[in-house]
Amino acid sequence: MKRYIRQSFLFLAVLFLCGCASTAAIKHDNSQQITLSKIENHLGGSDPWEGFNRSMFAVTSFVMDYIARPVGIVYTSIIPRPVITHIKNICLNLAYPTRALSCLLRAHWQGAGDETLRFLVNSTVGIGGIFDPAEYWWNIHSTESDFGQTFAAWGIAPGETLTLPLLPAHNVRDTAGLIFDIATDLKTYIPYAGETGATIAPYSSALTTVNNLSLTHEVFKQVVSDSNDRYKNYRQMATFFRELQLRMWRYHALNTRDNLIKAGKLPRPLEKSPAVIKPEWLRGEWLELKDFGPGSPVQDSLRTILFRAQDDSSYWYMPPSVFNNCFSNRRKDRNLALFPNRPELTYAFWSMPEPEEDKNGNPVPRREKLAVLLPGIGGTAPSATPTAFAELLNKNGYAVLVIDSTFTWQFTTARSGCRLPGFLPDDARAVRKIIKLALNDLKKDELVFNPEIILTGYSFGGMHTLKIAELEKNDPQIGFKKYLAVNPPVSLAYAAVQADKMAESMNKYQPQQVVDKVINTAGIFMANMANAQVPFKENMSDLQKGAYRLQADPETAAFLAGLYFRSSMRNMLFAAHSERGLIPLSHLPVEFTRNKLYLELDKITFKEYAEKYLASEYPGVKLDTLYRKSDLNSLAETLKNDEKIYVLHSINDFLLSENDRKFLDSTLENRITWTSRGGHLGNLYYEKVQQKILKMLE
């Protein structure tokens, strides 16, 4: 005990020195944009020890990949998920003194009382903390407090970013707080129990360590997956998540909900959806979506996160388990070499579902069907929307092939010369070549034989789908039965302007004001992404329907959507700059100091990308020609005459101008369906929309 007390006072002294010496907040320059990296640096500091932090993170990354992953596969295959959860519950229950003292020392009396009640209830009714009846029966929620939060409440600045191997703290203040967390954790004083503050530690028991690793690795994998700079993703997500913790967002949100229910103010009566009048000029099919609720087109679009794979979790087994047969685990990742001496491109494949059997137990004959799916900007096979779309198709009898968007770093680095995307004719030719290679690869291994193939894409992938339809009409190479584009932009120039406006919508605010505006929405999003909602049905009760309405003001919704588009472009540009250098950029992609480069990359607008970066890829082509050939108006003849082409769109998609809507409608006529709401992809969670997609592909 004395050892921990001495260490605690020592680290407290260091904490005050470092905290006073440096603050995380950076003075705001009103002439500069509010970008993702600027917000990250405002919350976490400018990372002057970036080289050291990246080196330490590399150790964590190595352990997660080469120790935690194989150990987790074995452990989670032997130990069912409920047992792993119960062990975690016991560890959390024994950490009660840490959370209670943290609340007491910052005069958060309600939190201290709730933590004490939780400990008493879970230790008795919950059988030593194995179960959590305090949460599930009596709505007594954990504050998730620690001493880092206490020090923050005392006004101690976080200091600079400090990453140490396998520790959950990410700055000087929170690292010092870990010592106090350990000293006040009951597991520290129970032989062979160990403590749960660190991911792994010499004083942890083997069981605690392995259990923590199996849980931590899954979170780590989600944070760094699909990243070409793991440290950047990790720091970014850790910084934002820590801000939610410091504000005790989950605790306050749950208590607010409980109090409103007790007061009879929840569930609130559903706000009526404003009437959407079918335009007089519309010739295509009109699909009315009821009970969507009020909201701007961008607010509608944020509901994309509600479109999730349904069979993507197992009650009995964690994701690493060999017995977990959820939809994501049935995905086969396969690699293609597009060019010699270039990184291979990974594509995803799901086999057709098992055939139904007749009364004699024999498989019922069926057609072999393959759906090729092209995601939008930043979309890769493991991400949420492509996975949900693939599951929708797979459940309805299709084998599914998913190819990463051209607007990803993976696709860019696999292309010859690391060519930048955005010129529709070139991108579509490259995608068609990859589809052909993937089909040959699948046939070689007898995963498909002679399937009936349909091509579908959404957003930017929808544009590629329509351009490939034109290429196939002029030079048939694959033989698609049908094409379906969902919410394709018409004009990349117009779409780029809209995306830039959204990303710059909060430039008038100080960084802290931006954080205050978006943090609640970020918490709501994280809560929704943790649990998949069933498809929305219009005959649901008002209580059920209310769960699908996300709270985000129009300005915040626009800013978050713009950040997503910009971050996808940033990751792609970073990969290209690392590969061959991009002349307009002034900072080099140095291995251990990249913060200034990211600040520069984040400020690049889509307009600037087209004029300075994409145009330089085609020195003999004028910019207006690049725009014109990347516009769906250039495909007017094909769209009008090819009966295999279908489009599903939202009448209020913010990436379409009024002229764009009229062009699509007059050109496609009865082969386009307009939904009354949804913005850009924000209605895919509606059962009615999902059924329409499947019907259009028949």
Question: Where would I find each of the regions flagged by the language model?
Answer:
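Short, surface-exposed "cap/lid" segments of acyl-processing enzymes
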Residues: 352-356, 361-408
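Alpha/beta-hydrolase active-site loop
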Residues: 421-445
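Short beta-strand/loop motif that positions the catalytic acidic residue
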Residues: 647-649
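Catalytic histidine-centered segment of alpha/beta-hydrolase-like enzymes
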Residues: 678-688
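A structured, mid-to-C-terminal "fold-capping" secondary-structure block
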Residues: 29-43, 149-266
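Alpha/beta-hydrolase-fold enzymes
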Residues: 470-591
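N-terminal cap/lid segment of alpha/beta-hydrolase-fold proteins
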Residues: 278, 283, 290-363
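Conserved alpha/beta-hydrolase "acid-adjacent" motif
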Residues: 654-660
